[in-house]
Regions:
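Conserved catalytic alpha/beta core of Sir2/sirtuin-type deacylases, generalized to analogous enzyme cores
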Residues: 1-56, 62-225
Length: 225
């Protein structure tokens, strides 16, 4: 398999279009659409006095587009994040290991024999996903459990964000940047992913460890209204 790692996109006021296109080639999974509409929405978000929600699916965290989401946080363009558990999975995994370039037409049976998973045109080796997440997360859950037994999911994601910043590549983490900026991350389906599976696994031996789903939903409603 190709061992060229997926890289984040980084732009600033001096970035040339040719440089951006070059970065697209290293980002993996990028699809550009409705740029004009997106620009208008972003303009309104920046200029108007409002609470800015950013919501997106997990797949872009597996690509270099994560770098753009990071810059949204860095530049104070988001107040609240609503996303899926997969966002936590891919963000944490890519701090601990690399994802690689692949192709949509690759043979999944052959990849499986090599211990490689395919996410569109991004390749995720087994050693880059479930295993490192489990090894990293379980000791942290023990620490959190020792502090208290009852958690709102967003509180756990905040704690994980602070912890991931301690890793060598922690500065690349979206979750870490949100934690540093005190931006709350809401995941309506907290068990629907690798991180969620680790929470469930931890609960097997800590049955008084609980997630306050309804309390979090009420808190999110208060922010909206």
């Amino acid at each position: 398999m190709n061992r060229d790692p997926v890289k984040d996109i980084h732009i600033n006021s001096e970035t040339k279009l040719s440089d951006l296109i070059s970065q697209f080639g290293e980002a993996g999974g990028f699809v550009a659409s409705k740029v004009s509409t997106a620009t208008s929405i972003v303009n309104d978000m920046v200029l108007e006095d409002c609470t800015k929600f950013v919501s997106f699916p997990a797949d872009i965290m597996a690509t270099g587009t994560r770098g753009l989401m990071n810059q949204i946080v860095d530049n104070n363009m988001a107040d609240v994040v609503v996303t899926t558990c997969g966002t936590l999975d891919h963000d944490i995994a890519r701090v601990l290991a690399d994802y690689y370039h692949g192709d949509f037409a690759m043979d999944d049976e052959l990849l499986r024999e090599e211990g490689v998973n395919r996410l569109g045109n991004v390749l995720v080796p087994d050693e880059s996903y479930g295993i490192p997440i489990e090894r990293w997360l379980q000791p942290i859950l023990e620490e959190l459990y020792s502090k208290k037994k009852h958690w709102a999911p967003w509180e756990i994601w905040h704690e994980l964000g602070l912890k991931i910043l301690e890793e060598e590549r922690g500065s690349e983490s979206f979750l870490g940047k949100c934690a540093k900026k005190e931006i709350k991350v809401f995941v309506p389906g907290p068990t629907d992913g690798s991180v969620g599976s680790q929470l469930w696994l931890f609960w097997q031996s800590h049955k008084d460890f609980t997630l306050d789903i309804f309390g979090e939903e009420h808190h999110l409603s208060d922010i909206v209204h």
